[in-house]
Regions:
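A broadly tuned preference for mixed-charge, low-complexity surface segments
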Residues: 9, 38, 86-90, 94-101, ...
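Boundary at the C-terminal end of the N-terminal hydrophobic targeting segment
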Residues: 17-19
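Beta-strand-rich N-terminal accessory domains
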Residues: 21-23, 38-40, 45-47
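Sec-dependent N-terminal signal peptides
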Residues: 3-14
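A general marker of short, structured functional hotspots
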Residues: 12, 121-122, 144, 155
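Surface-exposed amphipathic alpha-helical segments
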Residues: 24-38, 140-171
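Conserved polar/disulfide-associated segments of primarily extracytoplasmic proteins
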Residues: 43-138
Length: 171
């Protein structure tokens, strides 16, 4: 019986050692599997897992959908890609741009996932045919953007691990 308890304890440590917390902002944290390769260039952080990779960037409203400067409407624009806002609030040309980008990205009602965790809106989609997906996390003042290339299991695991930070650093 002691052996089983010891084995369970050792295995539980191994599970915890398989990922690390990535603190994206004062409000957002997620568990990322251990990666042998982590690259950082400019505003992009890339994690490589064998044949899969995940990249993260903080969206710039001036650069996200170039040449349109989305400053002031960036969150509404991202929501509109997932058909969560009334596009009629946008000028006709911006509504058309939103619909075009949503279609280009391949966001459909069947492949999108939408969740609210605390003060975070988490919007994502995954295309199993191309084995790629994207996630947008709408934080209080930032929009985090993840791009996934790899299995739907990696996408689901990372998507489900996104959570609002309980401000453990601010106590």
């Amino acid at each position: 019986m002691k052996f089983i308890k010891l084995l369970a304890l050792v295995l539980s440590f191994q599970c915890f050692a398989q990922s690390q917390e990535l603190h994206l902002s004062q409000n957002v944290v997620l568990d990322v599997p251990l990666s042998k390769t982590i690259l950082h260039t400019g505003n992009i952080l890339i994690f490589k897992f064998g044949d899969s990779h995940v990249s993260h960037e903080v969206l710039s409203p001036k650069e996200f959908f170039s040449p349109i400067d989305l400053t002031g409407v960036e969150k509404e624009f991202v929501r509109s890609l997932f058909k969560l806002t009334e596009n009629s609030l946008f000028p006709q040309w911006l509504n058309a741009a939103s619909n075009e980008l949503s279609e280009t990205l391949g966001i459909t009602k069947d492949n999108k996932v939408i969740e609210v965790k605390g003060g975070l809106d988490i919007l994502g989609f995954y295309d199993s045919e191309s084995q790629s997906g994207q996630v947008f996390i709408l934080d209080t003042s930032l929009i985090h953007h993840f791009t996934f290339l790899g299995s739907d299991e990696l996408f689901k695991n990372l998507y489900q691990s996104i959570r609002e930070k309980n401000n453990e650093f601010n106590n």
